[in-house]
């Protein structure tokens, strides 16, 4: 079974729900970045969350970026989704290795840190993107994204994210859910949802049991009718290219390109998201300079 996201409603369309299975997606990220288990859990949770957040957006060309910058040893976490069901990301320190937490879990909160900021950038094709920034709450990522939704978008939300890493470092399972109250919801629905969320042990436990995204939502809402609206395949994929790299060089302007021509025989860069290397020769830099001058 491949990775995918489901979108649904519950409580007579008063709650919007998303759930994802992201095992292969997270495993691909682990392979690309040589992630330790702790770094894998941190990036995996973030990838899963952003994949669901992109599903909330309506435009085909809409983009969402999540940046988590805490004071922990993992450094920054950056995840981008430019298309529905396609994500990419990286962490500042993929080799961070910490002891298990007091609960015997991978200590993502300590890796991320308790001080810092969560920033969400949504580009829906307007002149300026929407940028929302909130303080990190726990560093566990799920709590922090729920706090972002409530504080920055005024949407009460519950976010559950999980990544289970085996003893050999392989990703055994990964996934999560996001539940959001729609406007003007009745108090009784809020109480029902709070009770349902309170009964969830952990997303990882549900995934370990082999629950699908549909199963996860059905188990959360129990006897309530869940209307499944959409199913979207999910994968890790980078859309970098030589053209994009050259466009970034052009954006530097004439003076900077002239400096590069004087100081370098050529430029090599590595994509943060997939590790692919790109090279621009001195001759190509001179061509780009002519374009910049025109």
Swiss-Prot record:
Query: Main subcellular localization, coarse class?
Result: cytoplasm
Q: List the disulfide bonds.
A: 238-240, 271-274
Q: Which GO terms describe its biological process?
A: protein refolding
The answer to whether the entry has keyword Endoplasmic reticulum is no
Instruction: Enumerate the InterPro entries for this protein.
Output: Heat_shock_Hsp33, Heat_shock_Hsp33_C, Heat_shock_Hsp33_N
Q: Does the keyword Transit peptide apply?
A: no
GO cellular component labels: cytoplasm
Instruction: State the Gene Ontology terms under molecular function.
Output: protein folding chaperone; unfolded protein binding
Q: Which UniProt keywords apply?
A: Chaperone, Cytoplasm, Disulfide bond, Redox-active center, Zinc
- Gene3D superfamilies per the UniProt record, alphabetical: Hsp33 domain (3.55.30.10), HSP33 redox switch-like (3.90.1280.10)
Please state where this protein is localized.
Cytoplasm
- Taken from the record, one Pfam family name reads HSP33
Record's comment on post-translational modification: Under oxidizing conditions two disulfide bonds are formed involving the reactive cysteines. Under reducing conditions zinc is bound to the reactive cysteines and the protein is inactive.
What does the UniProt function comment say about this protein? Redox regulated molecular chaperone. Protects both thermally unfolding and oxidatively damaged proteins from irreversible aggregation. Plays an important role in the bacterial defense system toward oxidative stress.
- PANTHER family noted in UniProt: 33 KDA CHAPERONIN (PTHR30111:SF1)
Provide the family line: Belongs to the HSP33 family.
**What name does the UniProt record give this protein?**
33 kDa chaperonin
Source organism phylogeny: Bacteria, Bacillati, Bacillota, Clostridia, Thermoanaerobacterales
